[in-house]
């Protein structure tokens, strides 16, 4: 027997109904999650220009299970949560002051963006050259596939990890504790040249994240390698990079041209003010994986043959756009919308619809679209990634 529930007052103006301004739709009097309907207005009432079916292009970290440890937590969005995301997977992780993501390595490259707080990262490359650095909000790091590394919180911190394989799982990485726990002690004794009883205190299973002590300064912790430091830094200070500034916002692009070690991930940090939008465009070289940092917005994706769908996004959401699919992103809120665009590529690339039309013979564009002079004369030969609505 169903439990009795308080009836929904469907005449309440705060309760959205699936009725579009053109009259299409009807009142929804059945079971529903009103909060989700409010958060996804363009899924609940799609724009009249939406048509056809597109795979889901949105998943929220709020819907991803947490892995809780002493020293921090983590959660992931992979192809298992967002099936279309075959190129990239993402992990949201937090560490306490002194919390350690243990020494480990991956088959995939790791790109990271610091969301808040400070952390220390270490790594050693295949030639015995080492690296140590502190990172803070807006800083990036990149570890190539197979490079062993660690992360430790200097204070409470949170960061986004991005991997160049949608099938990746943070919970199946190669860790030092797990390997040693599954290696016979006589083998460890031979490898390290010490008695077997020296390994009696080793963990019996994977540690993953643990609570440690806050380390001292980089200078006091740095180990001098006989082979020197890594030739290319694993750290990049993105917020210290001058942005491409526009009236409606800004863009900072980072790829192998200005962060040379980042061979498989390119990215852009995009700022869109209220009343502005990321212009109509597409990316010719890779799928796009997005992470929304602040604010709220909506994105419409066009994949051809009359098929376009609109999705709503807010802080903590992940978005996805297939390669070469046309799309735009609007700020639908009252605060600044910040998000990351990430690509499995060594270089960032996008094609602007406006610029393409401006650099094509005018008569050809006019005859193709039956466009008037007002539109044709307004086309821009230079790319403007973020544009403002007229009059705002």
UniProtKB/Swiss-Prot annotation:
Name its GO BP terms in alphabetical order: oxalate metabolic process
Q: Where is this region: Disordered?
A: 1-25
Protein localization: Cytoplasm
Describe how the cofactor binds. Binds 2 manganese ions per subunit.
Q: Where does Mn(2+) 1 bind?
A: 104, 106, 110, 149
Residues of the active site: 341 (proton donor)
- UniProt KW Cell membrane keyword: no
Task: Please list which residues make up the signal peptide.
Answer: none
* EC number(s) per entry: 4.1.1.2
Tell me the superkingdom of the source: Bacteria
Q: Which Pfam families match?
A: Cupin_1 (PF00190)
Offer a single GO CC term for the protein.
cytoplasm
Q: Which family does it belong to?
A: To B.subtilis OxdC.
The molecule here is called Oxalate decarboxylase OxdD
